[in-house]
């Protein structure tokens, strides 16, 4: 059995295996507290995320199970990877991942980014999205704080807790407003991988300009700001709006002409403007894909078609429509954790597949 040690972080009990030392708080989210720690086994710094009360409700248990499954499945240089997972004696779940020094939000609020950094960061975002989308996964909450960066400018997309299957009937508001695609605001349904491209376009604009492109105060204001720059959506897009109230609201707005992005981004390259215009398109089906963006002239300095992999297999979403009690989710989670350790043990050369001592 692994030996566990306890520490108090922000009034929260962290109960982790003795493999990890020197806990330091990094950040607090709605669903978990993240600390940095030293992995005694690898001598590397890692991030340890405690999932708060994962078994308190079926919704939270399912969300935790989904995040675990995604972290296990997604293996790519530009996506955060799982290095350990365990359940403490108090039945809290801890995800251990790579630790990167900062995130794009912190970088953007500290100083302007030079062109080569913007290109390299955007390239890595699109390279990661190409892989994620090929696995049948939509991130849904892409924003600067979910994009981690280290001192070598290596970039990794994180926080897949909200990610969902590519489903033509997706529902609800999920992503942070500034980066939210219009089809999420307008229809509450029928959205797909293209929402991540819109979010990436907003992040691209923010890297170029140093401030959010569409800083809406609420949903109505958000949509209004978007139309001030991009004009009124075309009729064929407006006619896809499912909600009658939303449809009435959009039709009541004054008609606006699209403004040239060049007017707003006067110092940007023509190729940067062209790529942004292809990302920030009202009609999702006319938006550039991640794979197409990688081939765009703006990303040419980094583009390597032989080193932009896709997923070997699609993610299995068969659990996602299940309405199960907490105890069932708990059993499924235990099974996934055992499977993870058995696979890792096998990869380490432990023939019997037993879980290595923590």
Curated annotation (Swiss-Prot):
A motif (TXY) lies at residues 171-173. ATP binds at residues 26-34, 49. Residues 20-299 form the Protein kinase domain. InterPro entries: Kinase-like_dom_sf, MAP_kinase, MAP_kinase_CS, MAPK_p38-like, MAPK_Sty1/Hog1, Prot_kinase_dom, Protein_kinase_ATP_BS, Ser/Thr_kinase_AS. The active site is at 141 (proton acceptor). GO terms for biological process: stress-activated MAPK cascade. Keywords: Activator, ATP-binding, Cytoplasm, Kinase, Nucleotide-binding, Nucleus, Phosphoprotein, Serine/threonine-protein kinase, Transcription, Transcription regulation, Transferase. SUPFAM superfamilies: Protein kinase-like (PK-like). Its main location: cytoplasm. Activated by tyrosine and threonine phosphorylation. It catalyses: L-seryl-[protein] + ATP = O-phospho-L-seryl-[protein] + ADP + H(+); L-threonyl-[protein] + ATP = O-phospho-L-threonyl-[protein] + ADP + H(+). It is found in: Cytoplasm; Nucleus. The TXY motif contains the threonine and tyrosine residues whose phosphorylation activates the MAP kinases. This is Mitogen-activated protein kinase HOG1. It comes from Beauveria bassiana. The lineage of its organism: Eukaryota, Fungi, Dikarya, Ascomycota, Pezizomycotina. The gene is HOG1.
